[in-house]
Design a protein with these regions (language model features):
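Iron-sulfur-associated redox domains of electron-transfer enzymes in respiratory
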Residues: 1-170
Length: 170
């Protein structure tokens, strides 16, 4: 299904070799002040990050309604496969949201990483905590994009009848 959809693949070790060949030391570079990633977006790389982001966005969209996100977070291909098989076989689960990361620990534990997953998870969490934006809807760049579609505020989007129907499902 993906033939022709992927041009190249580059892992962290290969990227590290490119930086080394070009004499680029990332730790010596000045931080970019244009980074507008939300806390949730920054946490995607570790197990539980997607669930956290979804929960914060859902609560941002419907602040007056308590929506209990019961996430089941699994990592590793075998665990993901097991959860999918269990669901397909009709096994009950209390979760209403499933997050499956193919790599152990999430992307931070992927193949050819250059630091161990535990250390990478801590770095990802620290990076996330540095964000002053909780959700994408608190990001001025996202609001500019929504404006291009004729949506001037989150409240306006939430008053859209189709969106209300989608979010009102139990």
């Amino acid at each position: 299904d993906l033939v022709g959809a992927i041009d190249y693949v580059l892992n962290f070790r290969e990227l590290q070799e490119i930086f080394k060949a070009l004499n680029i030391n990332l730790e010596e570079l000045q931080p970019d002040d244009k980074d507008h990633a939300s806390l949730g977006g920054r946490l995607y790389a570790r197990t539980g990050g997607v669930s956290f982001s979804v929960k914060t966005v859902v609560n941002r969209l419907e602040p007056t309604r308590v929506i209990k996100l019961r996430a089941k977070k699994v990592d590793g291909v075998k665990e993901c496969r097991k959860v999918l098989d269990d669901l397909q076989n009709g096994e009950k689960d209390d979760a209403n949201f499933f997050e499956g990361m193919g790599c152990t620990g999430g992307c931070v534990g992927g193949p050819r990483t250059i630091i161990d997953a535990e250390k990478a998870t801590k770095l990802v969490n620290d990076f996330g905590e540095d964000s002053y934006i909780l959700t994408p809807f608190d990001n001025m760049n996202i609001l500019k994009i929504l404006n291009q579609f004729g949506i001037n505020s989150i409240e306006e989007m939430m008053n859209n009848e189709e969106m209300r129907k989608l979010l009102s499902r139990e």
